[in-house]
Amino acid sequence: MTIHIYNTLTRQKEEFVPLEENKVKMYVCGPTVYNYIHIGNARPPMVFDTVRRYLEYKGYDVQYVSNFTDVDDKLIKAANELGEDVPTIADRFVEAYFEDVTALGCKHATVHPRVTENMDIIIEFIQELVNKGYAYESEGDVYFKTKEFEGYGKLSHQPIADLRHGARIEVGEKKQDPLDFALWKAAKEGEIFWESPWGQGRPGWHIECSAMARKYLGDTIDIHAGGQDLAFPHHENEIAQSEALTGKTFARYWMHNGYININNEKMSKSLGNFILVHDIIKQYDPQLIRFFMLSVHYRHPINFSEELLQSTNNGLERIKTAYGNLKHRMESSTDLTDHNEKWLAEIEKFQTAFEEAMNDDFNTANAITELYNVANHANQYLLEEHTSKVVIEAYVKQLETLFDILGLELSKEELLDEEIEELIQKRIEARKNRDFALSDQIRDDLKERNIILEDTAQGTRWKRG
């Protein structure tokens, strides 16, 4: 079964054939680290971490690069407002980013390059563009000469005449054409800066990714990915810079994930309708948030609400409960062989259907449907009077494998009997104090861990589900 990817560049699904057999070069645009990320910012890391995991499952060696923009107008503004320097703020929010996305099940990239650690190659890249006639200096700034690049607009599918019609030169800009964009910005008084052939300054946003992608992955990469808001102008400008310099295709497959909406309106810091990952993972299990995000195809928008999150949690718990029941039945199962082939054949069908979904442009929504199907089928098998260890192990292994591909975990560490008794005692005390909210919370927490409570006249009994 071959993998097909929807390529933004061609607006169609294409068979995925990497440049090098069994190797994938993948670049995902990372955050500007001036604040905590919101759940809209967290969607690309989760989506493309899942893409990476599936490619690795299929046997590819994935070189996964995701950058940090650690110098930028937003960082400079934050530094001025807080009375701190830019590196201090950047370091703080790089660490916060790692805490958030690690909680959400994302693996670290092969490389996480930072702009400030790659200034030499960025300046060199700009100088080469100037030498080739694709860029020009203007009073300390350097701009890309868009009209010199014939393919401009091909990613966003916009004719250059239409783009130019809607563009304008802002006050203070020193460019020749409204579509020209900054590669290097002259430093203003009091701003952080680096020395360059054009004077003191810092790079523009777009050039950073082109330079770092080239350094770590080469002139041509297999997959370039990010949120759909980056397609224009950021990714369009990356293509122009990179292909003008090398004369080669910059990226062969372009992937873009959809927005997250709050009440049908795009979530963004500028609108103030955002939910920080830093906050929501204190309220909800990060694994639930990831499962919720993957329940929708990555190119589709997600309308976020706590009601939908709770509904998704119910489904996730059904799968986890089935898994827990399978694990507990393992002990009492036998080496029975009757009818094994029938059940094992059905299990294999679920595996095939899961892979077919993922091969179809990483359709995690359909893949998760197969997780529900596995759980439902396993529950039917558990109704059998006698169960086979071989079949039970096949269900368990399949659920573990599929969850791992999606970056999800199936179970928390099992509670010891003494820990359960302690929690029951706390619940009894809470009920005596008429703290029914705490009592219910303890009961629900135990239920999530597959511990069922039964209140009787003789006291509270418990059993593993």
From Swiss-Prot:
Highest taxon above the source species: Bacteria
Positions that bind Zn(2+): C29, C209, H234, E238
Positions bearing Phosphoserine: S270
Residues holding ATP: K269
Record text on cofactor binding: Binds 1 zinc ion per subunit.
Xref: Gene3D superfamilies: Cysteine-tRNA ligase, C-terminal anti-codon recognition domain, HUPs
One Gene Ontology cellular component: cytoplasm
Coiled-coil residue spans: none
GO annotation (BP), single: cysteinyl-tRNA aminoacylation
Motif placement: 'HIGH' region: 31-41
One Gene Ontology MF term: cysteine-tRNA ligase activity
Co-factor requirement: Zn(2+)
Motif range ('KMSKS' region): 266-270
Catalytic activity from the UniProt record: tRNA(Cys) + L-cysteine + ATP = L-cysteinyl-tRNA(Cys) + AMP + diphosphate
Enzyme class at the top of the EC tree: ligase
Compartments where located: Cytoplasm
Pfam families: DALR_2, tRNA-synt_1e
Quaternary structure annotation from Swiss-Prot or TrEMBL: Monomer.
HAMAP family in UniProt: Cys_tRNA_synth
Protein name: Cysteine--tRNA ligase
Organism: Bacillus cereus (strain ATCC 14579 / DSM 31 / CCUG 7414 / JCM 2152 / NBRC 15305 / NCIMB 9373 / NCTC 2599 / NRRL B-3711)
Gene transcribed to yield this protein: cysS
